[in-house]
């Protein structure tokens, strides 16, 4: 089994990444804790996934200033829970960019007046879109979870539960063919055996914390089913319930061709096509 530790040495201000790569082939991921990733593509596009940032206890303080994220091209949200939709509506309005997520979530955001239809378009699992150019394909796939949207009504001050659509994962195929599978929140399910040969993900972003998502043992089994070149564990340690650890995931995974990169919040990792 291959493992590397990737992240940001906050005290020294040093970023640890893979060896230098030609800019046109480089893919850079910034992890902001939980399931939040900023993806810089080889063609210069910026994709933000599940931006739970300002209220995230694991996001470093310097990144809680949303302006530091820079210009974004699109936001992807895997489901309606607050630790995934997070700051997405704020960023969408601030930068005038679209949020793509479950169709039911888009409907709710529009119905409640949080976003306009232009900023919350609809799609569903199985669909593939090209919202930021023909060379980047984004496909929604199944996730085994729930997706309620919790809303505090500004008039009544009461907490309301609204439709959030079905939870999803995202297959993100970049300009150079490098493919990322962000699983969102999910349990283990049998159709993961189809995703590997169908989409051939190079990089798997996989939840391991347990309780609400896969625990390390199930996450290891999912990794064996998908067989990516690389895997980054996520969605752990943010709350006491998410007790699974990267060490447990690595132990459960055992000997494998998948290279596991354990990141720290605020850290970056750089990839090329394997």
Question: Model segments located where?
Answer:
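Active-site-proximal loop/helix segments of hydrolase catalytic cores
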Residues: 151-152, 156-225
């Amino acid at each position: 089994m291959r493992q590397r530790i990737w992240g940001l040495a906050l005290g020294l201000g040093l970023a640890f990444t893979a060896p230098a790569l030609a800019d046109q082939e480089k893919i850079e991921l910034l992890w902001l804790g939980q399931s939040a990733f900023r993806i810089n593509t080889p063609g210069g596009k910026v994709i933000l996934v599940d931006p739970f940032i300002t209220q995230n206890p694991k996001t470093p303080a310097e990144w809680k200033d949303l302006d530091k994220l820079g210009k974004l091209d699109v936001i992807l949200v895997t489901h309606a829970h607050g630790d995934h939709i997070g700051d997405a509506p704020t960023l969408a309005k601030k930068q005038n960019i679209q949020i793509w997520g479950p169709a039911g979530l888009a409907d709710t955001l529009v119905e409640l007046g949080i976003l306009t239809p232009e900023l919350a378009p609809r799609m569903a699992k199985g669909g593939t879109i090209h919202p930021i150019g023909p060379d980047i394909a984004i496909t929604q796939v199944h996730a085994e979870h729930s997706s309620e949207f919790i809303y505090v009504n500004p008039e009544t001050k009461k907490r309301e539960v609204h439709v959030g659509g079905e939870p999803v994962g995202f297959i993100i195929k970049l300009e150079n063919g490098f493919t990322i599978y962000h699983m969102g929140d999910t349990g283990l399910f049998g159709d993961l055996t189809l995703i590997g040969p169908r989409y051939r993900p190079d990089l798997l972003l996989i939840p391991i914390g347990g309780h609400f998502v896969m625990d390390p043992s199930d996450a290891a089994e999912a990794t064996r089913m998908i067989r990516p070149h690389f895997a980054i564990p996520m969605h752990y340690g943010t709350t006491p319930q998410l007790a699974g650890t990267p060490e447990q995931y690595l132990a459960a995974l055992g000997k494998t061709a998948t290279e596991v990169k354990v990141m720290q919040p605020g850290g970056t990792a750089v990839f090329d096509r394997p």
